[in-house]
Amino acid sequence: MKHHLIGFLLVSSLSLIAQQGPRVNANRLNQNLDALSGYGRNALGQPNRVAFSDGDLEGRAFVIGLMEEAGLKTTVDAAGNIIGRKPGSQDLKPIGIGSHIDMVPHGGNYDGCVGSMAAIEVAQTLHDQGIVTRHPLEVIIFSNEEGGVMGSRALAGALKPEALGVVNSTGYSMGEGIQRLGGDTTRLAEVVRPKGSMAAFVELHIEQGGILDRENQDIGVVEGIVGLRWWDVTVNGMANHAGTTPMDMRQDALLAAARFVKAVNEEALKINGKQVATVGRIRANPGAPNVIPGKVVLSLEIRDLSDATIDTLYENIQKRAETIAADSGTTFEFTPLDTTGKPALTAEWIQAEIRRAAEGLALSHRQMQSGAGHDAQDMALICPVGMIFIPSKGGISHSPDEYSSPEDIANGADVLLSTLLQLDRKLTD
């Protein structure tokens, strides 16, 4: 009886493993992620792998080596994207996975890096186990995500020529940076992927918020990536002597701006939904303690999954500004800046496959939206996309304190692998 029981348990265990499919090598994944974190540190040992920096070049060389070890034919396209390709067994459109490895100044070691290293680990797992997908597999490490999702925008044909002149903290312009990465700004048109040219794209990413961590959930199934718009708001008053100008005779631009900041918060809260509005920067001129500010320039950012909601909130904020201007003897000017991204809904059928993958691995999951922009946002202009989130400890991101546990990272990679294989089986194009 004992032998029969042992045999039954062994068969059951093997059956469960077969149902779950292959799993990534968690130790290798986390070791490679840790190794990547060593590239691009500043003199204080802090993460600082900004796009186009020496550390970025070194990290990219490390990543290219891993991709080649995983059996991927790896090239750098004209926009500086690193693309590793493995042929499929059939003449089908490719399925893409990947993320980015560049970071904000003094950022963290997990934003983008988790998704990039997990995508490479997925390819390595398939290579190790001799699994050939029906669709060609593309692992894409996008260039300069933090500086305006440059690489993914180039693939989508949405990179504006004027963006090439934007200079980042390294001192290189975007155009110079592309050349530095091995790209070619004269051939950017060649990298554009027509709509429908890929079967699907799936990106694994840390949440960069605290919902999954707070609710003790393993996986976030992303419903959509919010769009965001930026404005510079200029408040014009009259600079005057702070000691000789009575309070009732002032045209204080900073006071009007302070009322505006409060109004932005109030208007964002009035609308039912998950929209957010932020004033994150403010500059008062002339900036002297004994002069009433005559001019203030501040930022305005609005994010939501709906363009219509962004429009409505912006209009409401403008109306509040008109009221404040009339009360304070000031004027408000709104200057729209280049948007970081349009709202992008993920494909519901890819969401379903991500949920199925999580459940097959006995991982808890919840639906959620992404409040941050991602490369998948621009890839949605090319093909159906999906996004998988894993918890960020304490909701901290864009900081050296950013952290996701090795277990959560491995869980996310396993969900990515399972989702990829399910899509490969089910997609017919």
Regions found by a protein language model. Give the residues of each.
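Zn-dependent metallopeptidase/amidohydrolase metal-coordination segment
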Residues: 21, 26-32, 42, 95-99, ...
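Catalytic-core environment of secreted peptidases
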Residues: 70, 82-114, 119
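A non-catalytic alpha/beta surface segment that caps or lines the substrate-entry region
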Residues: 41-87
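A short beta-alpha structural unit
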Residues: 51, 278-287, 299, 331-351, ...
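His/Asp/Glu-rich mid-to-C-terminal helical/loop segments that flank catalytic regions of hydrolases
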Residues: 223-225, 241, 245-271, 314, ...
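N-terminal hydrophobic or amphipathic helices/low-complexity stretches enriched
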Residues: 18-48, 87, 291-292
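Midchain, well-structured core segments that form catalytic/ion-binding scaffolds
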Residues: 148, 157-307
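Alpha-helical metal-binding/catalytic segments enriched in His/Glu/Asp
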Residues: 97, 106-146, 229-235, 241-267, ...
